């Protein structure tokens, strides 16, 4: 099967999985509200009409942590006897498909272990599952180089090649320790945006819309409020991430401000272009 044929099948499959997951969501929400023992690990498998098995995984450290996150959906497959994974990230117009190569997961384990971040107590044998249990905010970003892709997640940045307008091949991973100042600035702002959306979800029990984001008060962008929220949430992955980000900003404040202003101008220009 070619990559083009594979992506076509995955998109058809994902539509089926999405419909079935949406039908199950009310039951999952009741399970989440009743759950009393934490940390809580939950997983399920969805077998599609094409006989493909998709994984749905979820890990929450505390009750308040559980209120902030939804399960991750992905599928693994083995071209040429090497483990790959596929997952979708919602975009402005349609979902973007990421195909993660075995090389990406090799680099992920190598660099994550090097940083000694093992907040879940021990490494999960299945590295693909471990990645999706740790990373709930997986975001795609506009291309910097023609034919390239970039994504951000709690554990760092991933890079690769653009296969088509809505499909990318993920090849490698950079941990927070390896990021340059411009990369860390983009990462910092993406993760702080993640805190804002998690705060909203924990209070309102649904994902924030663009209209709701535009109406948020200044309180949602206060470092002090973020710190209080993370303290009560008690997710060690986010606690360490937050400390690392604030340390970075303190050590590179002038560069951070310049790059942040540049990103804001670029974002404004893109919004104007869409109007």
Give short role names for the model-derived ranges:
Residues 1-275:
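Ribonuclease/tRNase effector modules and their secretory precursors
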């Amino acid at each position: 099967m070619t990559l083009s044929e594979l992506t076509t099948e995955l998109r058809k499959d994902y539509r089926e999985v999405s419909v079935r997951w949406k039908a199950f969501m009310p039951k999952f929400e009741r399970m989440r509200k009743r759950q009393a023992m934490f940390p809580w690990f939950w997983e399920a498998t969805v077998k599609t009409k094409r006989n493909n098995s998709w994984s749905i995984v979820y890990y929450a450290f505390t009750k308040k942590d559980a209120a902030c996150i939804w399960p991750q959906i992905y599928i693994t497959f083995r071209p040429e006897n090497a483990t790959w994974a596929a997952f979708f990230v919602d975009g402005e117009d349609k979902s973007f498909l990421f195909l993660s190569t075995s090389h990406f997961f090799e680099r992920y384990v190598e660099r994550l272990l090097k940083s000694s971040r093992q907040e879940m107590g021990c490494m999960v044998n299945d590295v693909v599952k471990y990645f999706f249990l740790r990373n709930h905010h997986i975001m795609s970003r506009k291309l910097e180089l023609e034919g390239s892709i970039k994504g951000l997640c709690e554990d760092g940045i991933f890079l690769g090649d653009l296969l088509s307008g809505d499909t990318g091949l993920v090849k490698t991973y950079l941990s927070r320790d390896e990021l340059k100042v411009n990369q860390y600035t983009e990462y910092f702002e993406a993760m702080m945006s993640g805190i804002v959306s998690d705060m909203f979800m924990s209070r309102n029990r649904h994902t924030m819309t663009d209209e709701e984001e535009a109406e948020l008060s200044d309180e949602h962008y206060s470092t002090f409020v973020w710190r209080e929220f993370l303290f009560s949430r008690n997710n060690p992955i986010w606690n360490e991430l937050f400390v690392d980000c604030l340390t970075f900003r303190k050590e590179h404040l002038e560069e951070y401000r310049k790059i942040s202003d540049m990103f804001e101008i670029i974002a404004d220009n893109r919004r104007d272009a869409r109007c």
